[in-house]
Amino acid sequence: MDQDVMDFFDFSKEFKREVAPQGYISSDPKMMATDSIDSKVPKREVIGTEYVTEIVAKEKGLLNRTLRDECPQSKRKHTLDDLDTDDEEEETEIRRDDEYYKKYRFNLNRDKNLPIYAKREEILAAINANPVVILKGETGCGKTTQVPQYILDEGYKSGKYCNIVVTQPRRIAAISIANRVCQEREWQQDTVCSYQVGLHRPTSLEDTRLLYCTTGVLLNNLIRNKTLTHYTHIVLDEVHERDQDMDFLLIVVRRLLATNSRHVKIILMSATIDARELSDYFTTTNSIPPVISASHGRKHSIEKFYRDQMGSIKWKEEEDDQLVPQINDHGYRAAVKIIMVIDNMEREGAIHSRMSYDEALRYGAVLIFLPGIYEIDTMAENITLMLENDRNVKVFIVRCFSLMTPENQRDVFHPPPPGFRKIILTTNIAESSITVPDVSYVIDFCLTKVLVTDTATNFSSLRLTWASKANCRQRAGRVGRLRSGRVYRMVNKSFYQREMSEFGIPEMLRLPLQNSVLRAKELEMGSPVEILALALSPPNLSDIQNTILLLKEVGALFLTVDGVYNAMDGDVTYWGTIMSRLPLDPRLSRLIILGYVFNLLEEAIIMAAGLSMRGLYVHEGSSSRSTRAQFDSFWMHYIFADGSGSDLVAIWRVYLTYLNMVEIGHEQESAIRWANRFHVSLRSLKEMHLLVQELRVRCTNLGLIPFSVNPSQIMDDREKSFILKVIIAGAFYPNYFTRSKEMWNEHDRHIYQTISGHDPCRTVYFTNFGPSCMGELYTRRIKDFFHDARIPPENMDVTFQPGSEKVFVTFKQDDCVADSSKLVSVPGRVQSEVYKAVRMRLSCMQRIIRIMRPKQFMNYVQERGIGDVIEGRWIPPTKPLNVELLALPSVFSKTITGLITGIINCGKFYFQPLSLAECIRNMSEIFNAPQQLRKYVVDACDISKGMMVLAKRDSNFQRATVIRPENQSNRQPMFYVRFIDYGDCALLPMQQLRFMSEELIQQYGDLPPRVFECRLALVQPSSMVHGNYSWPTAANDLLQFVAKCGRIDIEVYSLFNNVAAVLIHMRNGTINDKLVAQKLCRRSDEDYMSRKDHDFRLRSQESGRYLSSAERQQINEEYLRSCQLPQDFDLPPPPQDLCGTNVRLKGPYSPLECSMQSIIRVGSSKRVNIDSASVNAVLLDTDPQDHHDHLIVAHATVESPNGQTLTARGTTLMPNVQGYGALMVMLFCPTMQLKCNEEGTSYVSILAGLGCDPVTGEPYYAEHDVLINLDVNILEDDLVLINQIRYYIDSVFFNFKEENYPAVSVNERESIYTQLRSLIKRLLSKDRSYIGKNMSNSDFVWETNPELPMPNEPFGKRAIFPMHSLTELKEDDMGRLMNLRENCSMLHKWRNFEGTLPHMTCKLCNQLLESVPQLRLHLLTILHRDREKQIDFCNQ
């Protein structure tokens, strides 16, 4: 802010030299370490729960001393609200509440039919006599609603003050139960009885005596108050669920109950509870909690059958397979057999029973419990196969899982069609959340999927495991509602009894502990280890240690405690305080924190809320909807992402659309239609809306309030999008992945070879369609494959390669004036249709085509005269091509003079050579002759798409093609046309069109355009200036200005697919260089085919001087002919009844499909997938000419059960900015080492993470160390900028240890905000030169270097982002420079060699060169040209 701060970042100032880490690492062609011995993570020792015994013994000793050392001399009386220790032997003043009880009506008549009523007196007596009571009552016995009322009624009778709180694990339960109690007692809501979920609570709780709340609400209140005495009774319901909130609440309750709140009564309730475990947990020397059981008999009996009791079903799998949690084919078939047995049983029973078979069907629904959606779909397929084999059994299949829409979930409750049996395929959602009355049969595979997190890696995995007996009992309880029922358990009885656990694994033993550790810190009653050791099921000590490392990584904890490093603890940062107060995962809280820093708090809150929601997008299962509907469901993600390549941006835009609809006040039916159209869940959006509101309030309470900026400082959409991606990268470090490119030498060539020279950004291909299939006759049927992807057949060309089994589908570019509202934006150069096509393959859409047999085919084409048959070989019909008439530039022409006649943007404009001016004039005179302009268009229906007409351009009529009709305005027909000989487009009324006479069509119908398409060479749009690979308006305006100047000279760099890459000469250089200098675009490599053509043109122009004019013409015609791609014949296919052979095509594929790699050490050797619901599920190389990896950031990473594969969720594709990944790592890592090459002349790699032990050099958190090999130059200036940004982020939240809140003022925040925007822009908009990858042998090694100067730390050890140190670079050795220049000179000499090249290495770029063509193309890359500049090499 002032000069002193700026001086701090000046590396030219003198530094105090101290010991600091430093070292070298290796690099490879994938920007990361290879899977070498060094890169493999040493196995971290797992430390179990041995630590618990000592801590628990110490705790019990403390509690016993507290009970024993009571002070009998004290005569002080106190009330229940006293926060001091409540000594049981002292007389306690009873607080009365008579006036309150007179204020409200108390009806003491309780429902005596509920089973719990029989235990009423026993329960009340136990509560009066014991501090803790355990109540075990079956679901439906009435414990949740009645027990709190019993307590309140007793208070009313005695006049004693009561304040009861009842916890519920879910929001909806707390709300609905409170409303039900109010209705039962006829109390007005939010008076005697109320609820609190999150921050949603009554304005005042003064009159509330019975509060239903979520577990987290009570937990936060107790941690904040550090006493229970605000309540007289605390009822913890559904204790068996054992989530982390409940387990931590038990710790807090037990601790406070024994210290300062011993007069508060605790009631623990559940349907399936381990009563002995809980009783032991709360047992003290003075008290053992009693256990009371309340159950009710069932009206209808339930029979249970196990696998070994089902004799009629023959099980085929091996005995060992029965022990593995899985469902194999035998299991699915066995379930189908059970359904058939049930049906036969009921048919026979109907003969001897009063209930008819049809009635039995109606009340005989079968509920099948399966572990996941995949198993549900597989089970449905098996049942469908059964129906095909046995027509007598009719079933109505209903799916039920959490991601379905509420409308589809309601199908579960509807009766089946007459004569059908309802089969419900469900996950464990139907265990307790859904009760279906007509279920009489349950088939239980006794399996479930649980989320387990490895705390060392922070990777979560969804593991298939055996359900607990408690789960199975709840599942069995789903039958017998209306009649007797049966339960079929697909395991042996002995296995169920002996091997399956009684209860599930508590969350504290399988999920991340970050929130529990932060709560332990906030509780201030000991270290996290000391607090969590007191849990009902204590976690492993190594899990606590790993969690503390994770919290240090996200900035929630400092590395030190009171300035001293502690592996098991750390002081809480203000970031940690914020994270503990927000009901989110710490990384989502970090997203909000960084959103606040950059004044994009609202956007960050929305994204964080959306990521914490499950089922925002609707998934219906693979066979429940049409193929097109499934595809539309996925494609809506792209619409909302709007070309950002970000699931988070898509969430933000979905929510804004929903919010706008809510504010406008759309009716419910309209909202449902909108949700169905865009395949989003209204229920999830409503929950998300509530969470967004809650987060806003919590952020305000924490002082996180956005400030207003001047209109001139408001971010435009481009900058906001860019800054949001910086925030996302900062929030989810180090969940970074690189979009890996194959870097082997011939990969570029392989891309084009794969698709036979087509444009990879517009082309996909199928395989398995052999040459004998005569594919040209079936092009229309191949186009029909894309119907479900909504790609019209006229928007594609289908071509073939002779002798190949490939089919190429090339999508046409929508030329000009495209209807942008109908387009879906995707990042980079690749057309959206390519994404759609690849998604078709991933969605397993069927691609079967019926063809004729070869002999029949030959007869068919000969009879109809389709093409020619020569020597038994069919030659498809072709259009003659006169290449000499093409306006394309000659291979011998380097510079051409002419006019730019039509401009779409800098990447697409049209050039009319001056040599064709005479031809243009002659044509114009003919077209505008009076006799040619008399053919008026009278009826708009006579105009069709693709028709050639005469259209008015300026004052004359010219040749034009009709692109499409436009919506009629004022009944005036309008048409978009493209002028064939100028390239520009126009929207014209019908009156400005004329039909072409047959004479004109015959003469000019086949004449190629008198212009050719161009694009600027060696440049591409900059992500910093404009997103979605779009050219900025300022760049297009400059091109328009140049075009208006008249004649210009263009230099043809290359010609590919009839598009010329050109450099446009100006007075002071080229427009290409000027746009780069003005930062309106950035330098770019040309792709393989362009460089190949450029090299060919250079050599042709060199040799052309020695050729005659006729020879040059012949060579040029051959060259232009080779540039033309095969044609789409678009022949009518033969009738289906003549086609008797099925061919299954494989694909479509794109040669641009690429994979990802994790950059953290523990994930570097694992395969990486992207979640199938992500907008990046189809991952393509959006800029194939760019040879540098792109960064993808994930919100979360899930590991496969076998540990070999990672799945990235909530992904964002980062901008294609040079060195973006390295810059983000340096910006947001805790610390790093920037390492040099062996000569010390340049920085070559980054090792980032929590750092290492300064004595031993052992990394603190080796699993999450990040290694990046640099491919661009990082300079000292970059480090200065990065340190400044880190300083400013820290300064927003810095507070001294004795302060509760940061001291930064609003004015200072505005100044910081302005500085950060400027610094980020300067850092990311630099045009960095490229460097070759460096190799080293010390991957992931943190080393110490006593010579390394340590920067001064403005915030000392209380910095979340400490300053990075910098190694001073050395000057290049002159001998080494001369060696490199000599190597370059030799490479240039070999460039013109026509023989076999001995293997060479470009020492500048560390690139092995194996052939002369490869050498030539390498010399044209930006990498090599930049490196030549760096060593001042000039080729003579």
From Swiss-Prot:
Enzyme Commission designation: 3.6.4.13
GO cellular component: nucleus; P granule
PROSITE patterns named in the record: HELICASE_ATP_BIND_1 (PS51192), HELICASE_CTER (PS51194), TUDOR (PS50304)
SMART domains documented for this protein: DEXDc, HA2, HELICc, TUDOR
Alphabetically ordered keywords of this record: ATP-binding, Cytoplasm, Developmental protein, Differentiation, Helicase, Hydrolase, Meiosis, Nucleotide-binding, Oogenesis, RNA-mediated gene silencing, Spermatogenesis
Residue span, Helicase C-terminal domain: 337-524
Keyword Hydrolase found: yes
Domain Tudor per the UniProt entry, residue ranges: 940-1003
Highest taxon of the lineage: Eukaryota
Protein name as catalogued: Probable ATP-dependent RNA helicase spindle-E
Species annotation: Drosophila yakuba
Gene this protein is translated from: spn-E
